[in-house]
Curated annotation (Swiss-Prot):
Main location class: secreted
Residue stretches spanning the membrane: none
Reported temperature dependence: Optimum temperature is 60 degrees Celsius. Has a high thermal denaturation point. The Tmax of the protein was estimated to be 78.2 degrees Celsius.
Annotated function: Xylan 1,4-beta-xylosidase involved in the hydrolysis of xylan, a major structural heterogeneous polysaccharide found in plant biomass representing the second most abundant polysaccharide in the biosphere, after cellulose.
Provenance organism: Aspergillus niger
Pfam families: Fn3-like, Glyco_hydro_3, Glyco_hydro_3_C
SMART domains named in the record: Fn3_like
Top EC class of this enzyme: hydrolase
Protein family membership: Belongs to the glycosyl hydrolase 3 family.
Swiss-Prot/TrEMBL GO biological process terms: arabinan catabolic process; xylan catabolic process
Lineage of producing organism: Eukaryota, Fungi, Dikarya, Ascomycota, Pezizomycotina
Name of this chain's protein: Exo-1,4-beta-xylosidase xlnD
Active-site residues, as the UniProt record annotates them: D315
Pathway: Glycan degradation; xylan degradation
């Protein structure tokens, strides 16, 4: 998604018209910024403007007698009838994300570009009172660490409820540019915070739960909001070493494309029925993603089963980037034609609106080519009830949502729950945590809160945030609970100045407990900004080491914040650092969540969804190397292929209590299955044979400790003989969260394992089930294991269409 430069003020449709075509020649980019280096597109006001929105009047307006207002007709027929009324100029004026509408038809201007990554953004928030804020949830990477798919769905559902309430007040669109389901392949990536982490199966489940939560249970008849799966595909670098995302050409094998970079989009299209997909800035194997019919037609529509009339939007200015910097087209008009013909329906930008007339004049496009995309967009709007005249809940359950629904859903406190469930306990020496109120009564306890995150407010939200109702810093949270707080920033995120060290050490000296809150934030990891290093930045480690030396017997707890990981090996190995937690970007209630985890009002059960690599990893090979498998200087990427030793592994996470994990009565320690017998089973109710359940991995989980706690599980598979080498170290095949396991209680964990979990991807991109021996193991400790022997002949279970 493109950087919006600054938050724009609302404009009327007339003002938008003034921003449009007359300025095209004056504003046309003739400076030719080197977008091979510059990662922020120079977006024009017409693109980035937020506008007041209104519904077409199908009762009394000019369209009332047209098919578009006939609620008994199909959404596609209604949309096609509307677009047929447009003149060519009117058609072109509605090909951008900011559609100008058609005033003579009573069709209002419409803004496609709304954001909903972890709450409403690019909404027309009021200055005060109603519609002044919306719930700001934790960033997806922290939410995913909770391993709670119900939570993901619930968050998305709340976002869409609040979005529809804002929409009914003319303050938000019916389409959202979310979720970001790219995988967090390399730790330097600045936008990893927006993603579900480095594992593609996690990303696929996140995509399904988020999209179905946003779109509602019946998207074909009553679409709640249209989700957009982004960024398709192979997008996970911003500006590493001046390699701009706008001009990157990512070389990706068919094997890695099929196995890692696209399965989450396959699930989004086939299973979640996502209504929109965003093509990415980058090129893949020489072709810009928004000009690649292989991605947009062969894969997305023909193979992945994208909904018939779903639309593809470019990332913002990506259509222009086909010309500059990719040089794939000789002019902006040619770039517009390439994108349209490849399958990019809507241009988030102005290239279509300013240059499609030239494309037609050159004979590169016809009106029909352009119409197709606009019809697809308006089909989605019809499904969302944009043209419905009857606003009763019986016919459209979303048109009556209002500010009271925003208040109600925020009061559920799900943002807080998501943060407490996602926070990961990395280290807890001698079980120093939790710092219970019994041992540390707030009225008699002084807490030193030190570090650049100790008084964080806006930092808690990460990026793509709107107006939150409140932002609770760690400092405010501890003060609210009655603790005496000695606050000292000590140092900044990237500071090398030691001028604040003395105050920090003084604050620690007179405290009973020392908490250092630091790490990274959006000054180092953001859109258009990758990290150069994955070490702790600035002199934060120096300050922590001084605090550790001065702590004596006092607990020293370090909060490692931010979306990406930093190398905390020195803290892991320092016996004076009592505990270490990863808190991500925990949202509006982040301070409360961190405090309550530390004090034991909530117990941690999150697990890392990224690998914490040693700092040297970022220097071993180029971040633009997209090959997952180890080769040359590349030691392998993600936990699946990494051949080195992680500081903290993917899936690491500690509890305050102890659990005994054992085979359940239904567990068979060795299973022999015939491939042909499995694949011959009927599966008409499944979209793919890969979804067919093969077995249930079961285990007994007994809480043997002293505290009630949730339990989180990851089930991994590995093999050393099924299919050709090289073999991955392991891969995730399932996961779950058991809530509130009481002391002494035993619960059964049951994780279904599907055919696709036993498939490996060959060099052509085909998913193949090979005969051989697999091992399934529970979590990193591997205390419960099942041996699975597959016999018979290898079979392709998913055929990958190669690019000719």
């Amino acid at each position: 998604m493109a950087h919006s430069m600054s938050r724009p003020v609302a404009a009327t449709a007339a003002a938008l018209l003034a921003l449009a075509l007359p300025q095209a020649l004056a504003q046309a980019n003739t400076s030719y910024v080197d977008y091979n280096i510059e990662a922020n597109p120079d977006l024009y006001p017409l693109c980035i403007e937020t506008i007041p929105l209104s519904f077409p009047d199908c009762q009394n307006g000019p369209l009332r007698s047209h098919l578009i207002c006939d609620e008994t007709a199909t959404p596609y027929d209604r949309a096609a009838s509307l677009i047929s009324l447009f003149t060519l100029d009117e058609l072109i004026a509605n090909t951008g994300n900011t559609g100008l509408g058609v005033s003579r038809l009573g069709l209002p201007a419409y803004q496609v570009w709304s954001e909903a990554l972890h709450g409403l953004d690019r909404a027309n928030f009021s200055d005060s009172g109603a519609y002044n804020w919306a719930t700001s949830f934790p960033q997806p990477i922290l939410t995913t660490a909770a391993l709670n798919r119900t939570l993901i769905h619930q968050i998305a559902s709340i976002i869409s409820t609040q979005g529809r309430a804002f929409n009914n007040a003319g303050r938000y669109g019916l389409d959202v540019y979310a979720p970001n389901i790219n995988t967090f392949r390399h730790p330097v990536w600045g936008r990893g915070q927006e993603t579900p982490g480095e594992d593609v199966s996690l990303a696929a489940v996140y995509a399904y739960e988020y999209i179905t939560g946003i779109q509602g249970p019946d998207p074909e008849s009553n679409l709640k909001l249209a989700a957009t799966a982004k960024h398709y595909a192979g997008y996970d670098i911003e500006n590493w070493h001046n390699h701009s995302r706008l001009g990157n050409d990512m070389n990706i094998t068919q094997q890695d494309l099929s196995e890692y970079y696209t399965p989450q989009f396959h699930v989004a299209a086939r299973d979640a029925k996502v209504q929109s997909v965003m093509c990415a800035y980058n090129a893949v194997n020489g072709v810009p993603a928004c000009a690649d019919s292989y991605f947009l037609q062969t894969l997305l529509r023909d193979t992945f089963g994208f909904v018939d009339h779903g639309y593809v939007s470019s990332d913002c200015d990506a259509a222009y980037n086909i010309y500059n910097p990719h040089g794939y087209a000789s002019s902006q008009a040619a770039a517009a034609a390439e994108a349209i013909l490849a399958g990019t329906d809507i241009d988030c930008g102005t290239t279509y609106q300013w240059h499609l007339n030239e494309s037609i004049a050159a004979g590169d496009l016809s009106r029909d080519d352009i119409e197709q995309g606009v019809i697809r967009l308006y089909t989605t709007l019809v499904q969302a009830g944009y043209f419905d005249s009857n606003t009763t809940k019986a016919n459209n359950p979303y048109r009556d949502l209002s500010w009271s629904d925003v208040l109600e859903t925020d009061a559920w406190n799900i943002s807080y729950q998501a943060a407490t469930q996602g926070i990961v306990l990395l280290k807890n020496s001698n079980n120093v945590l939790p710092l219970t109120e019994k041992a540390y009564p707030p009225s008699n306890t002084t807490v030193a809160l030190i570090g650049p995150w100790a008084n964080a407010t806006t930092q808690l939200l990460g990026n793509y945030y709107g107006n939150a109702p409140y932002m609770i810093s760690p400092r405010a949270a501890f003060e609210e609970a009655g603790y005496k707080v000695n606050f000292a920033e000590g140092t900044g995120i990237s500071s090398t100045s030691t001028s604040g060290f003395a105050a920090a050490l003084s604050a620690a000296q007179s405290a009973d407990v020392i908490i250092y809150a630091g790490g990274i934030d959006n000054t180092l990891e953001a859109e258009a900004l990758d990290r150069e290093s994955i070490a702790w930045p600035g002199n934060q480690l120096d300050l922590i080491q001084k605090l550790a030396s001065a702590a004596g017997k006092k607990p020293l707890i370090v909060l490692q914040m931010g979306g990406g990981q930093v190398d905390s090996s020195s803290l892991k190995n320092n016996t004076n650092v009592s505990a270490l937690l990863w808190g991500g970007y925990p949202g509006q209630s982040g301070g409360f969540a961190l405090r309550d985890i530390i004090t034991g009002k909530k117990n941690p059960a999150g697990r890392l969804v990224t690998t914490q690599y040693p700092a040297s990893y970022a220097e071993e090979f180029p971040a633009t190397d997209m090959n997952l498998r180890p080769e040359g200087d590349n030691p392998g990427q993600t936990y699946k292929w990494y051949t080195g030793e992680a500081v903290y592994e993917f899936g690491h996470g500690l509890f305050y209590t102890t659990f005994a994990e054992s085979s359940s009565n239904t567990t068979t320690k060795e299973v022999k299955l015939n491939i042909q017998d499995i694949l011959s089973q009927t599966h008409e109710d499944l979209a793919s044979i890969t979804q067919l359940p093969v077995l249930n991995f079961t285990a007994n989980i007994r809480n043997t400790g002293k505290l009630e706690s949730d339990y989180t599980a990851m089930v991994f598979a590995n093999t050393s003989d099924a299919g050709p080498a090289p073999y991955p170290k392991k891969w995730l095949v399932g996961w779950d969260r058991l809530g509130e396991v009481k002391v002494g209680e035993t619960r059964e964990l049951r994780v279904p394992v599907e055919v696709g979990s036993f498939a490996r991807v060959n060099e052509d991109g085909d998913w193949v089930v090979f005969p051989g021996t697999f091992e399934l193991a529970l979590n990193l400790e591997r205390k419960v294991r099942v041996k699975v022997v597959l016999e018979g002949e290898e079979e392709v279970v998913l055929k990958w269409p190669g690019k000719e």
